[in-house]
């Protein structure tokens, strides 16, 4: 008879844990530890939105098993500055098998995590790098401060009049 209450409590505890784990991915499940308060898109949806809105894309490529990726997640998610700057980008979060096979998404190698910036047309802009990082791994960011600096550089280069003028020159 004592087994029944324990079994019920164990089932309730298991269900609660399952609910906690599944709800930690947020309403759209795209945060993956990088912040459910950020409006994440898939790459396909992000490219469409960027083309329609004129906003650049910020793409994070990471793996669920990667130690450096796991270390970056809380720093990224807890940064109010990243959260604020994210409103000026279409944010894309690619994990594991979601990583694109296109070589443009690994301009200097397939290491992880990588953060790339794309212009509103969906073209990877390899000139936007982590200026304060390892020169052998130009798209590897280890701190929120480095990410913020990259976002500010991308915003400066890929939005506003400067980008439009440069983009028009390229088309002519």
From Swiss-Prot:
Sections of the chain in a coiled coil = none
For the biological process aspect of GO, one term held by this record is: negative regulation of endoplasmic reticulum stress-induced intrinsic apoptotic signaling pathway
Read off the CDD domains from this record. Answer: ERp19 (cd02959)
InterPro entries named among the record's database cross-references: AGR/TXD, ERp19, Thioredoxin-like_sf, Thioredoxin_CS, Thioredoxin_domain
Q: What is its EC number?
A: 1.8.4.2
Q: Which domain of life is it from?
A: Eukaryota
The record lists its disulfide bonds as 66-69
Q: Which reaction does it catalyse?
A: [protein]-disulfide + 2 glutathione = [protein]-dithiol + glutathione disulfide
Q: Where is this motif: Prevents secretion from ER?
A: 169-172
A GO MF label: protein-disulfide reductase (glutathione) activity
Q: Where in the cell is it found?
A: Endoplasmic reticulum lumen
Q: Where is the signal peptide, in residue numbers? A: 1-26
- UniProt entry keywords in alphabetical sequence: Disulfide bond, Endoplasmic reticulum, Oxidoreductase, Redox-active center, Signal
Cellular component (GO) terms are: endoplasmic reticulum; endoplasmic reticulum lumen
What does the UniProt function comment say about this protein?
Answer: Protein-disulfide reductase of the endoplasmic reticulum that promotes disulfide bond formation in client proteins through its thiol-disulfide oxidase activity.
| Protein name per Swiss-Prot or TrEMBL | Thioredoxin domain-containing protein 12
Q: Which organism is it from?
A: Bos taurus
Record gene name:
TXNDC12
